[in-house]
Amino acid sequence: MIAGTEKGKSMVNILMLSKWHVHAKDYASMVKAQPDAKITCVWDEDAARGQAWAQELGAAFEPDLDKALARADVDAVVVDTPTADHKRVILKAAKAKKHIFTEKVLATTMADCLEIAQAINENGVKFCISFPRLTWPLAQLCRKAIDEGSLGRVHYMRMRVAHDGALRGWLPDYWYDKDLAGGGAMMDLGCHPMYIASYLLGKPMRISSVFNNTCAPGGVDDNAVSVVEFENKAIAVLETGFVGSIGGEMFELLGTQGAIIQVGKYLKMRTSKFEGGWYIPDKLPEQQAPALR
């Protein structure tokens, strides 16, 4: 998204909007790794944190968001603010004609998401949200198998993405503040199964969910599941949690003539084109470039 944002421009200048998110440092590293992108400025809702980060990155710090967005040496922004603040900062960035890369999730309500989309379209800026697993080999393998028809009619998907952040206490305390984060495990980790399901199965039609809290501070959900029915009648069971010390990564995609199953790093499949039953693919699709590129 960043490289080549401005046609003919040799260097794209980036404004980092907050270090709140746990992946903010990773995104800064990705920007710095690009030969044609540079972090020129940092803004943060926590001025002390932002000032320290700007010094670490060798960039300017601007405590006023409007002034930061008005800088001539800013072409695009990377949004890592609290989720609850996404709408405000993204709308300002769009109106300032800055291209936008944002951490997921986009916003905390559908109305806010639609307002953001409208502002992006009206202001003609480029936009990308971080859905990293779309670039992973598993997603590309499944997409190819569906497109080729080698699984038959796909009718079921199950995906689990979980970790033990609440169970073992390694997430920052503010991660459990619903007023900042917008929710708990499903809002954070659960979005990965959600967008993969949409990528593979199409448009969702109805959803039923169960969220509960076992140990996470603040009462946010740390153990959750959603069952989604799609327009093509496929059903997806999408699981997540902050208490998943074992079995954090599981995936199943089932069709009338084949299936793809992955547990951890172990993957096997069977298709209508292979008569020998289950097999392990010799080669998976290549990992695609990250969205920030």
Region spans (language model):
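C-terminal glycine/acidic-rich active-site capping loop/insertion
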Residues: 132, 252-293
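Predominantly a Rossmann-like dinucleotide-binding segment in NAD(P)-dependent oxidoreductases
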Residues: 22, 134-217
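Rossmann-fold dehydrogenase core element
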Residues: 115-133, 153-156
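Beta-loop-alpha module in the N-terminal Rossmann-like domain of NAD(P)-dependent dehydrogenases
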Residues: 46, 57-119
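Hydrophobic residues in well-ordered beta-strands that form the structural core
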Residues: 16, 63, 101-102, 127-129, ...
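N-terminal Rossmann-like dinucleotide-binding module
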Residues: 2-56
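Contiguous beta-strand/loop segments that form the cofactor/metal-binding neighborhood of enzyme cores
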Residues: 195-268
